[in-house]
């Protein structure tokens, strides 16, 4: 049958998934959609610059940049973390620290892209797959250049994009829309935090990002080339190296150093026609 949502507090008389209370009327529609597992897809991203794969590979020279975020001079990281649905608020965007219009032009700063996701079908193996896509999605924005992965990244924003009104909330909006579009099979809710405060970035890096990276690497160490029956191709970097293709095995990462065999396997599961395809060892 159909779930029922009422605006009176039923307390312990609620039946999860069938009869639930929502006393805040502003949350009634959201709860109703959630109970019926109905997801709304955004067809146009409301940002002040163009957004398309045609901009992937755009190079922004130092003389043309408004600001830069780089691990060479400041702490940086990108992390996707799976949490329970009641721990996050869908489409919540938080900017911690100074925005682009408050940062000194031409200088380098810290940056953390911290994404929390929740979903009944979400697995920890899918986290690095979503992280890898941050590279492409940032590059899809006109006037934005992104290179690297994990805690070794560089992001440049052009003066032209800044003057058009591009701000960090637009970065977060792009991430939210693309995650809910490309990973809607496994992600039901998504919350995004963009951090430029150096101390906060360092805290996220040390307490959350590095332990997560280490746990993934440790799991991979138990696998060998002989213990699996297939390898995977990876063409994620073709935005910058159009003719390049890596062969990823348990003992050999992609040349970028960020795509492991488990990442490639999860990418294939999430996107069967995507950049990672199996290669039989036979």
Across the structure, where does each feature detected by a protein language model lie?
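Cysteine-centered metal-binding/redox modules
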Residues: 1-282
């Amino acid at each position: 049958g159909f779930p029922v949502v009422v605006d009176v507090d039923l307390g312990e008389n609620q039946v999860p998934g069938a009869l639930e209370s929502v006393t805040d009327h502003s949350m009634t529609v959201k709860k109703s959609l959630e109970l019926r597992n109905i997801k709304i897809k955004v067809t146009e991203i409301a940002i002040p610059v163009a957004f398309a794969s045609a901009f992937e590979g755009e190079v922004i020279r130092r003389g043309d940049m408004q600001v830069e975020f780089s691990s060479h001079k400041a702490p940086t990281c990108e992390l996707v973390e799976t949490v329970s649905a009641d721990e996050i608020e869908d489409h919540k965007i938080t900017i911690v620290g100074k925005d682009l219009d408050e940062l000194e032009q031409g200088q380098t700063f810290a940056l953390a892209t911290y994404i929390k996701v929740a979903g009944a079908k979400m697995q920890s193996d899918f986290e690095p797959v979503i992280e890898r896509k941050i590279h492409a999605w940032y590059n899809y924005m006109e006037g934005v250049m992104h290179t690297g992965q994990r805690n070794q990244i560089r992001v440049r924003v052009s003066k032209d994009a800044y003057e058009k009104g591009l701000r960090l909330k637009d970065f977060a909006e792009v991430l939210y829309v693309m995650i809910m579009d490309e990973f809607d099979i496994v992600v039901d809710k998504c919350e995004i935090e963009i951090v430029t405060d150096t101390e906060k970035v360092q805290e996220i890096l040390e307490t959350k990002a590095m332990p997560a990276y280490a746990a993934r690497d440790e799991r991979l160490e138990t696998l060998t080339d002989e213990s699996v029956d297939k390898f995977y191709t990876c063409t994620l970097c073709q935005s910058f190296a159009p003719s390049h293709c890596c062969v990823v095995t348990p003992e050999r990462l992609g040349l970028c150093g960020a795509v492991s065999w488990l990442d490639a396997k999860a990418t294939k599961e999430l996107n069967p026609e995507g950049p990672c395809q199996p290669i039989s060892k036979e």
